[in-house]
Amino acid sequence: MPELPEVEIVKQGLNQLTLNKRILGGEVLLERTLAYPISVADFLRGLEGKAIAQWHRQGKYLLAQLYKWGKKNSKLQEYENEDGWLGVHLRMTGQLLWVNPEESLHKHTRVRLFFGHNSSGDKDSSNYELRFVDQRTFGKMWGVPPGKEISKVITGLQQLGLEPFSPEFSPKYLNKKLYKRHRPIKTALLDQTTIAGLGNIYADEALFLSGIRPTTICKDLTEKQIEQLHLAILKVLQTAINAGGTTFSNFLNVKGVNGNYGGVAWVYSRAGQPCRICNTPLEKIKLAGRSTHFCPQCQK
């Protein structure tokens, strides 16, 4: 599943390519991709004649702020909802690809949005196309009507913990979230109510960098360990963003390019290989149903 760095990379690409272009229309090839509204006609009606002012990311959610084509977007306030929003969650295998409309259609294409600078709503007159490709079909899209509170429509936003790069995310916050918890630290880090956007790959990586074994019970962590973990989370996420994210199976950026973090990963997907620090063979276990990688020597 794409995690915070991958979704951030997609957001950055979308902000470079899709802003201020008229949405001419669209085509929904798999109706269950739509979480809200479930009517294809209502979903497309909410997008046609709009343009995207800005893409935002909250955890693993992508949120596009819309405005009516022809209206200046310079006065839009962040997260105001005058003309609607488009929400996307890639889930396990979702991809958002910016392509030439003449490019052949991938068999797992679920939604197509047609962009251009003209007034026609015909897909044949579009200059650009945004495709939502999703092999496993778990990905979702939302059309948030004007005036509606975004989190009332995309209800998963209500449960998210802090963004790791927000000023409020601190060792004190992390300690408060983990204090007295009787579950393994790896499991706690995967909980989106603890940290928004952190997932399996970067939880393993951050625990390695902080020297904490994934099975360590939260309540047993010292303040020093929590401080180290806080720094490690920020470091590994920024490193992954700089590398364009991680591609082990399905992740591509909006131009269809793989991420490069996998080649420099400390422990994730490297079971049996030597630790990059001490050369001890790395181990892999199942923890709360998730593959978990660690160094038995460096992580105590």
Swiss-Prot record:
Residues where DNA binds: H108, R136, R181
Zinc finger (FPG-type): 266-300
Keywords from the named record: DNA damage, DNA repair, DNA-binding, Glycosidase, Hydrolase, Lyase, Metal-binding, Multifunctional enzyme, Zinc, Zinc-finger
Any one GO molecular-function label of the UniProt entry: class I DNA-(apurinic or apyrimidinic site) endonuclease activity
Cofactor: how bound: Binds 1 zinc ion per subunit.
EC annotation from Swiss-Prot or TrEMBL: 3.2.2.23, 4.2.99.18
Requisite cofactors: Zn(2+)
A matching Pfam family: Fapy_DNA_glyco
Swiss-Prot/TrEMBL catalytic activity: Hydrolysis of DNA containing ring-opened 7-methylguanine residues, releasing 2,6-diamino-4-hydroxy-5-(N-methyl)formamidopyrimidine; 2'-deoxyribonucleotide-(2'-deoxyribose 5'-phosphate)-2'-deoxyribonucleotide-DNA = a 3'-end 2'-deoxyribonucleotide-(2,3-dehydro-2,3-deoxyribose 5'-phosphate)-DNA + a 5'-end 5'-phospho-2'-deoxyribonucleoside-DNA + H(+)
Catalytic residues (UniProt): P2, E3, K60, R290
InterPro entries reported in the protein's UniProt record: DNA_glyclase/AP_lyase_DNA-bd (IPR015886), DNA_glyclase_Znf_dom_DNA_BS (IPR015887), Formamido-pyr_DNA_Glyclase (IPR020629), FPG_cat (IPR012319), MutM-like_N-ter (IPR035937), Ribosomal_uS13-like_H2TH (IPR010979), Znf_DNA_glyclase/AP_lyase (IPR000214), Znf_FPG/IleRS (IPR010663)
Classification via SMART domains: Fapy_DNA_glyco (SM00898), H2TH (SM01232)
Gene Ontology process terms (BP): base-excision repair
HAMAP family: Fapy_DNA_glycosyl
UniProt family annotation: Belongs to the FPG family.
NCBIfam families per record: fpg (TIGR00577), PRK01103.1 (NF002211), PRK13945.1 (NF010551)
Self-association and partners: Monomer.
Annotated function: Involved in base excision repair of DNA damaged by oxidation or by mutagenic agents. Acts as a DNA glycosylase that recognizes and removes damaged bases. Has a preference for oxidized purines, such as 7,8-dihydro-8-oxoguanine (8-oxoG). Has AP (apurinic/apyrimidinic) lyase activity and introduces nicks in the DNA strand. Cleaves the DNA backbone by beta-delta elimination to generate a single-strand break at the site of the removed base with both 3'- and 5'-phosphates.
Protein name according to UniProt: Formamidopyrimidine-DNA glycosylase
